[in-house]
Amino acid sequence: MIRQNFNADWTVEKGDGNSRMNSFLGNTQTKTVHLPYDAMIHEARTPDTKNGAQTGFYPGGEYIFQKHFTAPQAWQGKPVSLVFEGVYQTALVYLNGWLLTRNVNGYAEFTVEAGPYLKYGADNLLKVIADNSLEPNSRWYTGSGIYRPVRLLVGNKVYLPQDTVRITTREAGEGFALLDVTAQVQSASTVTERVTLQQTICREGTAVLTDRQNLLLRPGESRTVSFRYCVDSPALWSPEDPNLYTSTLQVLEGEEELDREETSFGIRTLSIDAAHGVRINGQTVKLGGACIHHDNGILGAATLPDAEERRIRQLKEAGFNAIRSSHHPAGRALLDACDRYGVLVMDELSDVWNLRKNPYDYALYFEQDWKQTIQKMVAKDYNHPSVILYCVGNEISEAGSESGAETNRRLCNTFRELDPTRYTTNALNGLMAAGYRLREIMGDVMRKFPAQPGPSGGDGGGSNALNSFMSLMSGEKGDYFATHPLLTEALSGCEDSCDVIGLNYLTGRHVLEHELHPHKAVLGTETYPADIVRLWRIVEENPHMIGDFTWAGYDYLGEAGCGIFHYDGGANFSSIYPERTAYIGDLDLLGNRRPISYLRESVYGLRKAPYLAVLRMERNGQTSSKTPWMFKDNLSSWTWPGFEGQTASVDVYSASEEVELFLNGASLGRRAMVDFTATYSVPYTPGELKAVGYTGGLCDGEFTLRTAQDAQMTLTADRKTLQANGEDAAFVMIQFVDANGTADLHTKHTLKVELEGAGILEAVGSANPCSEERYDTPESETFDGCCMAVVRAGEAAGEIHLTVTADDSVQKQLTILVQKAEG
């Protein structure tokens, strides 16, 4: 079908259930927006919001989106539909006053038929009410409104329905690949039609094969057609070499093109088993995975393609080769980016089934909605080579019951029926699955470990209550819990019907499961970040262990305070305003890598050079709160003014056998690495701190920190040219760097950002997890020496001029070119 971007020229206003009367009385404030648009990020945060820390104290609400458009006379009699990739939470879609649909899954794409309700050659009004007023619902920051793109689809008398072209790799090797291509062809004609289907497959713009089929369609008939091809010397898709092809299928009547469908795909084979793990094209791949939520940091939930691409690129550069879409179906832009960068995907169905975790979550609708959600999910994912696993649920409350086991079986079977080329799993949490057995299990745990304190914090329910309790279940006690016979009994029902056994925070079971299920692969679907050394050792030593997914790869909004270091006696999971982010990602909210990211990279075997990190010296002698999701409150910095002569705790992370630390050229000793870490106590003296790694007595890498001198503000944009499409975005990092390139992470600065020209200032903010600053205002204070501005292109060509003022005095400017949009 012909696709038209339908994101421009919308208006949005706040609703309260009486929108028509408010509009009549003039009591509303209407804003013109270009989708995607997250309304929640523009709300004022309050300590008393119903969502509490779960959304970072952002409230929900009702939002009314409207768009006027003209339907050409040429559309009359043709199939016309609208595709909404994501509207949170409940969406009511009206066209010219007619209710077209009510969608209850805020993370699932949905399509509505528009043709019968259009006024051809006249003005039409499309209205979407996005209702996120029933709170709390999801256990994290959700966003509100039409936060993903909208497309208009127009067919012809014979057309190819959306997502019905499927390309399957049957065999692949160095010399050839065998492909099956199937497509659904639909007639909207009242007479018999004779058409030709022309298939072209291209690699980097060059056709590698073409084919044609003739087809007869009777009035209203739908037919499935099949092609089979042998591709010579294919460029296979893999995480290391993510080669992509494009399939173009045209519907021709003579020389006239009635329709076309362009599909990006990769040629690759996939298998998962207990003997070899995950194999892509016959080669074993261990999954170094990152769990991620769907927000884009200071942008909120708005799914800008450039934001999704940036996030995946940064995760890949940090050493991850896989992501888990937690805990809902991934958006199309995210999957496109994963295809391009070679990042494998575990796509996830839902955080709940039929038992609620929050009063107004998806459990209210799951039973009547899950099948169509799976159908849409598979249709969306099928041609993405990055997608290898479907996860049917996360920490499901009823997983340990007979009814839960039966639901698990139904879900897995449905995925297999719709897509037999991929594999199923379920992210099982022992505390949730134990059910009625939990009291007896915990009794045994407490008798084994009698001196352990009870859970603290946990105000507000949802994530806070669960996470607070889970924080006790780590280390030796967690392993005892994980391997308890009653827990084995509870998990067995769901494990039996999944292709891959998925375990959340049950490291003690990673080896045990192979004894219990010798023919099943096992995956750490969610694990504690600081346990990476132990976790990856298990992955490397056991073929049945296919990988590990850390929680989390990228910091995110909501579940606020999970990883914040409290030095004032505060407890994590206690809904402490103004905490806003979880603060537990390997990458912070702006995408900067934190020290644990470099430790992980060394553990993965991807980094030879050592890395240095220093505990924050302003916290010397203080004791902080601690949860298993927290690593260390450290920075890669040797700039600590005012702390001269005080002792700094310095970590060296390295895959070398030994490291030697030098301060201003003087050796502080050589030490053997223990679990990829060596720790030194160093009197802080400005200058140069250098770590040198040795393996077999030979130097195999070094890393140096220097004290920043007279750091000046710098502006660095990730791109200097945008398309004038209303959606392209540039991410501008604002830092303070000296003449030698050393960043000052210590000194704080107050920034004001101004924009003129062919774009808008979409967001300004820092990675500070606890701040009352808004992201939709032009002012921010730096955190760890950094702040970021997101610039979004307008719809006209020109230039964007960005001016940043620091501390009401120093200014820097940056120019970004906005070119006429392609197409």
Where are these regions (language model features)?
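Substrate-binding clefts and catalytic carboxylate motifs of secreted carbohydrate-active enzymes
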Residues: 4-5, 11-20, 390, 413-416, ...
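Accessory beta-strand-rich segments of carbohydrate-active enzymes
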Residues: 2-19, 36-43, 54-161, 189, ...
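Edge beta-strands of extracellular beta-sandwich domains
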Residues: 260-265, 697-709, 811-819
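Beta-strand-rich binding/interaction modules
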Residues: 95, 176-216, 225, 648-666, ...
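Extended acidic/polar, glycine-enriched regions
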Residues: 119-121, 182-273, 683-686
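Short, hydrophobic beta-strand segments
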Residues: 114-116, 227-236, 679-684, 778-795
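Short flexible loop/turn segments that cap and initiate beta-strands
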Residues: 193-198, 239-246, 647-649, 655-657, ...
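Active-site-adjacent substrate/metal-binding segments within catalytic domains
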Residues: 41-71, 75-83, 88-104, 157-166, ...
